[in-house]
């Protein structure tokens, strides 16, 4: 359990805290009003992107680390096999979710950025086969 707790703090807690602080500072900066200007739509989109990225980070990684800690705790307390099997299955389900976080971030930035989203839409239109309508 000590090893699992250390791993959770070093490999999840610390990066999550650093990410949370950095994105939080960015969000605070974006929320500050500029003299003579209202809240621009680009600032709101940036705030939305920050919220989405942090939510996906938490949804992908929190279940994995909690489940892994519960698994090691159950092993330490010599829980019966049925409990260990249930926790092990949940762990195996959450592990790919944790790995998926690395793949999801670039996609999130791709789909939340106007420039890239418009280029992707244009690419999809160009690559889609054109239908000819005949009378």
From Swiss-Prot:
Keywords: Cell membrane, G-protein coupled receptor, Membrane, Receptor, Transducer, Transmembrane, Transmembrane helix. Residues 73-90 are extracellular. Residues 26-49, 113-135 are cytoplasmic. It comes from the Eukaryota. InterPro entries: GPCR_Rhodpsn (IPR000276), GPCR_Rhodpsn_7TM (IPR017452), P2Y4 (IPR000018). The keyword Transmembrane helix applies. GO terms for biological process: transepithelial chloride transport. GO terms for molecular function: G protein-coupled purinergic nucleotide receptor activity; G protein-coupled UTP receptor activity. The chain crosses the membrane at residues 1-25, 50-72, 91-112. Pfam families: 7tm_1. It is found in: Cell membrane. Expressed in brain, heart, stria vascularis and vestibular labyrinth. Belongs to the G-protein coupled receptor 1 family. Receptor for ATP and UTP coupled to G-proteins that activate a phosphatidylinositol-calcium second messenger system. Not activated by UDP. This is P2Y purinoceptor 4.
């Amino acid at each position: 359990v000590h090893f699992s707790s250390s791993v959770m703090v070093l490999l999840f807690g610390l990066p999550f805290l650093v990410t949370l602080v950095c994105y939080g500072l960015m969000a605070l900066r974006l929320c500050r009003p500029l003299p003579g200007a209202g809240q621009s739509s680009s600032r709101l989109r940036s705030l939305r992107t920050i919220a989405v990225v942090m939510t996906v980070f938490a949804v992908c990684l929190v279940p994995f680390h909690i489940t892994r800690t519960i698994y090691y705790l159950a092993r330490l307390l010599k829980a019966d096999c049925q409990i260990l099997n249930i926790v092990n299955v949940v762990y195996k389900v959450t592990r790919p979710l944790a790995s998926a976080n690395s793949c999801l971030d670039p996609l999130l930035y791709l789909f939340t950025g106007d420039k890239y989203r418009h280029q992707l839409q244009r690419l999809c239109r160009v690559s889609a086969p054109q239908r000819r309508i005949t009378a």
